[in-house]
């Protein structure tokens, strides 16, 4: 995480802290049920797990739940399997269009190169994808990212063949030749780059446009305000730990 990215995240988190504190002051806890928060394998959400492993949540009924991608988190939230979720801002907004009970309480990450489009080694640039098969997750983020990448390269969706893929299918589909390129992130990104895939586009070319958030239900805010406040406050402390200790990144990779 660069110093600029960290400072941006910390500033946004501090601003939201004031808003959340004011909101929660007016809430009276009604229950003490566990707060289930979903997340996926993305660096920005690891701070939740770091805070847990540092013991920051020991006195609170907080349960962290892993999902392969934000798409599964959205599904789980709609099915009432979780009360909170780590979601890209577009996913949170799309979910909010049909689920009026969801609120963003924190900015978790601003993507600066983590979201990528990877292609065959022989592809020189994005324009080499004309007429090619490009794997994309069927999500608002996937659609937004490929659209912006095409726009930045004077291309449109008509120039490529979109192949719908779940995140868990990205690596295999590329290696088996089912697609010529893939829009991906996280472990799949690292593995495909290690296997020789060519980086054609990444989120650093559209700075500030891909933001990851922590969103929770209004019921959770009303029923467990102290728990929500605890999550929020300790995220700030975990961010500081992340910056102050060189071995934190290795620890993050090991506990998931």
Residues covered by each model-derived region:
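Bacterial N-terminal signal peptides that target proteins for export
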Residues: 2-13
